């Protein structure tokens, strides 16, 4: 009975460790995606910032 308890404990422990490693990798991947989205949004904001009044990109001579 003692051997059965030890092996069951070992299986559960290894499963828990494996699960926590997978969760950590998943969390890191989600953080990377969020950082990429934030970066893209800031680039879009920079592209479409309002132009100051009287500014013309092309000068007429």
Swiss-Prot record:
Chief location category: secreted
This protein's UniProt keywords: Amphibian defense peptide, G-protein coupled receptor impairing toxin, Hydroxylation, Secreted, Signal, Toxin
Signal found in the keyword field: yes
Biased composition (Acidic residues): 30-42
Keyword match Lyase: no
Signal peptide segment: 1-22
Database matches in InterPro entries: Frog_antimicrobial_propeptide
Modified residues (4-hydroxyproline): 52
MF terms (GO), sorted A to Z: toxin activity
Purpose: [Val1,Hyp2,Thr6]-bradykinin-Gln,Ser: Induces contraction of rat ileum smooth muscle (EC(50)=710 nM) but has no activity towards smooth muscle from tail artery, urinary bladder or uterus up to concentrations of 100 uM. Binds to both bradykinin receptor B1 (BDKRB1) and B2 (BDKRB2); the effect via BDKRB1 is stronger. Induces contraction of guinea pig ileum smooth muscle.
Record's protein name: [Val1,Thr6]-bradykinyl-Gln,Ser
Native organism: Pithecopus hypochondrialis (Orange-legged leaf frog)
């Amino acid at each position: 009975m003692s051997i059965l308890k030890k092996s069951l404990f070992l299986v559960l422990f290894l499963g828990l460790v494996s699960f926590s490693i997978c969760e950590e990798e998943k969390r890191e991947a989600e953080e990377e995606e969020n950082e990429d989205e934030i970066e893209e949004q800031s680039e879009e904001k920079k592209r479409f910032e309002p132009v100051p009044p009287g500014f013309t990109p092309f000068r007429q001579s």
